[in-house]
Amino acid sequence: MATLTNGQVDAAVHGGAASTNGLVNGISHTHSPASCATIPMKDHDAIKLFIGQIPRNLDEKDLRPLFEEFGKIYELTVLKDRFTGMHKGCAFLTYCARESALKAQTALHEQKTLPGMNRPIQVKPADSESRGEDRKLFVGMLNKQQCEDDVRRLFESFGSIEECTILRGPDGNSKGCAFVKYSTHAEAQAAISALHGSQTMPGASSSLVVKFADTDKERTIRRMQQMAGQMGIFNPMALQFGAYGAYAQVQQQAALMASVGQGGYLSPMAAFAAAQMQHMATINGLPGAPMTPTSGGSTPPGITAPTVTSIPSPISVNGFTGLPPPQANGQAPAEAMFTNGIHPYPVLQEVVFREDSEKGGLGVAQRSCFGVQGSCFLSSLSEAQSPTAADPLQQAYAGVQQYAAFPAAYGQISQAFPQPPPIIPQQQREGPEGCNLFIYHLPQEFGDGELMQMFLPFGNVISSKVFVDRATNQSKCFGFVSFDNPGSAQAAIQSMNGFQIGMKRLKVQLKRPKDANRPY
């Protein structure tokens, strides 16, 4: 290579040597924003525009003639995928003068449709331009008879209004709210200070509301929170704290035993609460969870363990009887299965108090499942026994069973809430075939925890992983989510593919099999 005579190698090595064919000089000029004679300068208040709905076959050189008629261009960049290099159908444009950007926006935004596109071109300030300088206001509690001109007259004394739009329903009637956009942040702030809560419009239920409009990111977060709330993510009743319910049930029933042992009779309200304890747990979707004994022994000392073939009937106290739990297809109660696939053998399933009306005494029959399938403890007290005779039995339940319930309760609660740092071990766990999703265009700030929270509404997420650049420790904006069944994965694809977060739309699709050339 050193023997070449045209100087190409020397020019490439030394980065500036003159070449006889001018090749190096030609390359160096293609990357400059303009020729050496005229380097463009932009105003300090120049606006960076986002251009959307442009054909993917048009490059910078093809778009320049369209925008140059409104003023001198400082920078025009077509956005391309950093992984695939493909055209994204949008661009960023910065004029040297602010007025040129405003003219281009007025003339082109949703006014012209480029060849091959179904929607008109979008020309508006980029998010980064408005993030630090909010100018758009939300106005609420307006009179529904007011039109745009009335709203303009109300706000025009505080500055120049660029946009004024009243929100209307499908029938065309006003919703009593509007958006007002000023040319500067200071004008918008002045309108808020002067008008917010200052008066009550005719027909409005409260005073005028004037505040900055939500950003795209805030609206996206609110939509996700609403969706999560509807799906029950943040509702403790949907997390199936069966063990926690069993722990509370143990404590309440131990208190009932103590009150019966001391007074011999329960108040009607306490008796009714005891009778409905199991029924409320059933209708709330909180069946008692199976408990594992904390010690090696399966029964407390001095108590025999006869076999019981079925789960006892609901509580009956002072004549109040709880509703029986529902059974599907005539299945036996002892073999019932809940949605989490666990057999319902709850701690302290039944406490029965019988009042002997003839002798005026008190009989207590008590059954307690102790976490062993089909094995329960049965102990009975005759009506001749004194209240103090129940103390050993009471101590057995109060001192052993409530502590047996607590570890499993704590374990289920800790598993139900997603833990941010170590949600997944170092290695990505995968679900069955057809249950693993590839997610692209994630926000830069999303981690494993946020990714899991976003997909929890669609089913049981067994793992979530956002890939991070090892050198910079920054997110690569893509990751994987694994469900335990294909139905949840398909539901997530249908709902989240194309879901917009900020300026990007999520790409959600099934992960390719391991034998494929690429994982996505």
Swiss-Prot record:
Write down the CDD domains for this protein, in alphabetical order.
RRM1_CELF3_4_5_6, RRM2_CELF3_4_5_6, RRM3_CELF3_4_5_6
Q: Which Gene3D superfamilies match?
A: 3.30.70.330
**Can you cite an annotated GO cellular component?**
nucleus
Where in or outside the cell it occurs: the entry states: Nucleus; Cytoplasm
Q: List, alphabetically, the SMART domains matched.
A: RRM
The regions listed as transmembrane in this protein's record are: none
Q: Which GO terms describe its biological process?
A: mRNA splice site recognition; positive regulation of mRNA splicing, via spliceosome; regulation of alternative mRNA splicing, via spliceosome
| Gene Ontology MF annotations | mRNA binding
Q: Where is the RRM domain?
A: 47-128, 135-215, 435-513
Provide the family line: Belongs to the CELF/BRUNOL family.
Q: What does this protein do?
A: RNA-binding protein that may be implicated in the regulation of pre-mRNA alternative splicing.
Q: What is this protein called?
A: CUGBP Elav-like family member 4
Q: Which source organism? A: Danio rerio (Zebrafish)
